Amino acid sequence: MRIALCIEYDGAEYYGWQRQRDVNSVQEELEKALTIVANEPIEVHCAGRTDAGVHGTGQVVHFDTTSSRKLAAWMMGANANLPKNIAVRWAKEVNEDFHARFTATARRYRYIIYNNRLRPAILGHGVSHYHDALDANLMHEAGQYLLGENDFTSFRAVHCQSRSPWRNLMHLKVTRHGDFIVIDIKANAFVHHMVRNITGSLIEVGKGKQKPEWIKWLLEAKDRKLAGATAKAEGLYLVDVDYPLEWELPRVPLGPLFLDND
């Protein structure tokens, strides 16, 4: 039996998604909880491996098991054994052709900036604080230069292990909600640190240091050293993963918190 789950987690206390020796990871905590419910060892496979400090509201995983449980039992049992900063949002039985990573057609992230001169006391690990005034409209204009299938070398981590820097960026929208700026970005896949590196460069535009056209120049330059600094991890959320409609996977609000699905 193969089960797919949607997972929400606060990544502030974890050294990323992937199980690693001697450090806390989201994968390890989820596998421990599911192992208790299944009464057998469980290994999960995820749609996207998030880095240390990065959060998820729409991470999708799958696992195989010989244990027969109702879907409600998988959800409630896992949540009863998970830390409070990790939760299962839905569960669905799928056939063996489904793979959380390889069946996915797109991933969607949101980066949340608290744009205020003073730092926040609440949500300190859930948003990235930037004190200088940012122009969200200019950031949105700049982001449109990245749409389509492009070589994202200028926005990929130096030690990225992906074989190709080419990705298809389908959607990028920057909006302001009071003191919060939201960068909403969707692509078929992402190279390492791609969202955070794009965010760092959009911030340069937002504070008036660079013009929107600079982003187009960066994309064409294919040189990471020319782009902005990598934005902090705490503002980043994996909010959704797309799959072919034939899988009929449940849908939940993207979030985080007050943000809608637009």
UniProtKB/Swiss-Prot annotation:
Q: Which residues does the annotation say bind substrate?
A: 109
Q: Name one GO molecular function term.
A: RNA binding
The protein's matches in InterPro entries, at most eight in alphabetical order, are given as: PsdUridine_synth_cat_dom_sf, PsdUridine_synth_TruA, PsdUridine_synth_TruA_a/b_dom, PsdUridine_synth_TruA_C, TruA/RsuA/RluB/E/F_N
Task: Name a single GO biological process.
Answer: tRNA pseudouridine synthesis
UniProt keywords, alphabetically? Isomerase, tRNA processing
Q: Where is the active site?
A: 51 (nucleophile)
E.C. code: 5.4.99.12
What domain of life is recorded for the organism? Bacteria
The UniProt entry, under Pfam families, shows: PseudoU_synth_1
Q: Which reaction does it catalyse?
A: uridine(38/39/40) in tRNA = pseudouridine(38/39/40) in tRNA
Positions of disulphide bridges: none
Q: Which CDD domains match?
A: PseudoU_synth_EcTruA
Main enzyme class? isomerase
Q: What does this protein do?
A: Formation of pseudouridine at positions 38, 39 and 40 in the anticodon stem and loop of transfer RNAs.
What's the subunit arrangement here? Answer: Homodimer.
Q: Which family does it belong to?
A: Belongs to the tRNA pseudouridine synthase TruA family.
Q: What is this protein called?
A: tRNA pseudouridine synthase A
